Each structure stands twice: as C-alpha cells, then as structure tokens.
A protein has these predicted regions:
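Glycine-rich phosphate-binding loop signature in dinucleotide/nucleotide-binding domains
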Residues: 2-4, 108-111, 163-170, 227-228
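Surface-exposed amphipathic alpha-helices with a cationic face
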Residues: 100-108, 160-161, 181-186
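Structural recognition of alpha->loop->beta junctions
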Residues: 132-142, 204-222
Length: 228
C-alpha cells in the first residue's frame, strides 16, 4: 500500500530523542534495592534482564510484572522515579545529537510532533524542563488514566486524536525498543521505525517488525520529509 502524506510523528524520549547512557538501568538498581532484591546474584540478574528486555514499556507495568503485588510495584516505581529525577538534577540528561533540530524541522514543515514516554507524567515534565523542551513538541504524553503505556497502542492513538491526524495511515512513529515497534504496529501506523541510538539493535528492531531502521531521529525526519 502506498503511504499517505505523514501528518504526525509520534516519537519516544529516552534512547530516541534523549540520551540514556545507562540512566534507566541505574534508576532500576535503586528501585530493586528499595524493595529488597539482593544486590547481586541470580534474582538481581533476572530482574535486570527483564528491565532491559522491556525497555520502552510503562515502568509501573514492568514493576508489577517483576514484583507481583501492587504495593511492592508502587514502592519500586516511586524509588525508580526518585532515582531518575535525581540523575536529571545532576545534569545527566542530554538530548541526542540533532534531536532538537529534527523535531523543529518536522514542525516547520507542517508535521505535528508528539513526544511520548514510559515514565510518569511528573518525571516527563522534569525531563522536558531540564532539556528546555517544554515548547519543543506539539504534545507530550505519558501513561496514565485511560492511556496505557507501550506495547499497547494508546499513546500513539491518543496523539492521533488530540493532534487531529486524519488516520493512522498519516502517522509515523519512532522508538529505540521492540516495545516501541510493537506499539506502532498495533496502532497500524504507516511508518513504525526503530532508531539505533538506544536500547535495542538493528536485528532486534527488525525482528519486532520495524518498517524502517534509522541511525537517529535526524534520519527519521529525513525519511518523512523525502516521502511527502
């Protein structure tokens, strides 16, 4: 099927537009310690691997799967958010090279941009403030009431509705994880692209069904603009 004109780009944050450099894993270590997971050994290794495998998903959903009970999951999530926000306060958050310019270029060419995350809305807002990105995109979205995180399609479909794209065939999505790709495929978007700036590699992204794999968000913007 020939793609229709892209009207909306839905773009992930950590690993896609924001450098990760181990920040998510470091914050997870604090969360695991907070709920009593031994600091070394097979239990810790299994939990760490699960976090790596589920990169891109809603963090509270990851902790529910890991720790079972809601109380432990909420405790772990709160510790994760505190640790990640502390890393932001220490100046550890930085944009991926060219991300600001790529997003601005898309918008200058009439393409709306939504920034999405698996973090809470509070952490997302803090990250945006640290980067000076409060007005960079048309919309920012995080999982919450009535909006499930990845791999569900809710973030993409919510962006489509709020930014009034004509259909999913007018939407392109970009992320660095297999969860991003699964979410985009479930939403039925025209372009479900993976980027090599984050958690998962070319083979993992293609095996997940990515329609395109690009080197960075700069290449993603070029892909969209070349196919208008």
């Amino acid at each position: 099927m020939q793609h229709k004109r892209i009207q909306l780009a839905v773009v992930d944050m950590a690993g896609t537009t924001v450098m990760d450099d181990g920040l998510v894993v470091n914050a997870f270590e604090a969360a695991a310690t907070a709920v009593g997971v031994p600091e070394s050994g097979p239990e810790r290794e299994r939990a760490r691997q699960y976090v790596l495998d589920t990169m891109g998903q809603s963090k509270i959903s990851v902790f529910r799967a890991l720790f079972g009970g809601e109380e432990l999951a909420q405790q772990a999530n709160a510790a994760f958010e505190r640790a990640y926000e502390h890393l932001i306060d220490e100046g550890k958050a930085a944009p991926i090279a060219g991300a600001t310019e790529a997003i601005s270029r898309l918008r200058e060419n009439g393409i709306r941009v939504a920034l999405t995350t698996g973090f809470s809305g509070t952490t997302q807002e803090k990250l945006l403030a640290a980067l000076g990105w409060q007005s960079l995109a048309d919309l920012v979205l995080a999982p919450g009431d009535g909006v499930r995180g990845r791999p569900y399609p809710d973030l993409i479909l919510t962006a489509l509705m709020r930014l009034e794209a004509d259909s999913v065939f007018n939407v392109a999505a970009l992320g660095d994880t297999t969860s991003d790709i699964e979410s985009a495929l479930r939403a039925g978007v025209a372009i479900a692209a993976g980027t090599l700036t984050g958690a998962h590699n070319d083979r993992q992204l293609r095996d997940a069904g990515a329609t395109h794999v690009v080197g960075s968000i700069t290449d993603f913007a070029e892909l969209i603009l070349q196919n208008r």
